[in-house]
């Protein structure tokens, strides 16, 4: 993934998390970045409080679906569009009525036989 694409995804997910948490009595956003050497991946987790009734979970990644006024937000649709280009990157979304979690998993590319140097 190109750095500008990662930056765009990070910005969208953080903006959404902050915006959702601001509407809650308990305002909480947690960001975690870690490396999983066993599965050879980097993981970005963004978790926030949210108001359950404002989120259309079934359609949230579709173009034109937004919690913003007049459905002006394109953020998650744009995230989805970027992610479709990278089979080694997954976004897992979960919610429990109090916390909304986005977990971005970026797996290392495995070099093909042609790329492996021969001594």
Language-model regions: role of each:
Residues 73, 96-103:
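Glycine-rich nucleotide-binding loop
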Residues 28-40:
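Short beta-strand/loop element within the Bergerat-fold HATPase_c
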Residues 48, 104-110, 117:
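C-terminal beta-strand of the catalytic ATP-binding
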Residues 27-29, 88-89:
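Glycine-centered, small-residue-biased loops immediately flanking beta-strands
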């Amino acid at each position: 993934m190109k750095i500008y694409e990662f930056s765009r995804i990070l910005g969208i997910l953080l903006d959404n998390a902050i915006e959702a948490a601001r509407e809650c009595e308990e305002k909480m956003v947690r960001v975690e970045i870690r490396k999983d050497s066993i599965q050879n991946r980097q993981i970005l987790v963004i978790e926030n409080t949210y108001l359950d009734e404002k989120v259309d979970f079934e359609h949230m990644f579709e173009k034109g679906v937004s919690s913003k006024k007049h459905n002006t937000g394109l953020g998650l649709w744009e995230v989805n569009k970027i992610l479709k280009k990278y089979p080694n990157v997954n976004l897992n979304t979960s919610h429990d009525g109090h916390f909304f979690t986005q977990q971005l998993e970026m797996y290392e590319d495995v070099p093909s036989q042609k790329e492996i140097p021969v001594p």
